[in-house]
């Protein structure tokens, strides 16, 4: 099973994920978490970091489609890790 949790910064995604992992473990379910962007783990995530730091200009001046490409590229580069986690967990 793949479960995606999305929300703005500070919304409690990490807390919810931790609670779900604890519940899964208590139930004997093999579970894992993967967080995006995967800062410094993929080339695209390095670019996401540069974008968020403002290294590419003010965030409101960077085309939204370009920013979306960076975030999507990070997920694409992470597909091998994601597929391994899916195969190795319940």
Which sequence ranges carry the predicted segments?
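Hydrophobic anchor at the beta1->P-loop junction of P-loop NTPases
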Residues: 3-5
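Residue-level signal for beta-strand positions within conserved beta-sheet cores that form or flank
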Residues: 1, 27-30
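ATP-dependent small-molecule kinase phosphotransfer cores
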Residues: 29-90
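Hydrophobic alpha-helical packing residues
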Residues: 20, 24-25
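ATP-binding Walker
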Residues: 11
């Amino acid at each position: 099973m793949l479960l995606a949790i999305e929300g703005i910064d500070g919304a409690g995604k990490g807390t919810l994920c931790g609670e779900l992992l604890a519940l899964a473990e208590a139930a004997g379910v093999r579970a894992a978490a993967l967080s995006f962007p995967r800062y410094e783990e993929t080339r695209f995530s390095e670019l996401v970091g540069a974008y968020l730091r403002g290294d590419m200009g003010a965030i409101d001046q960077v085309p939204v489609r370009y920013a979306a490409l960076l975030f999507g590229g990070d997920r694409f580069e992470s597909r091998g890790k994601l597929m391994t986690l899916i195969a190795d967990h319940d």
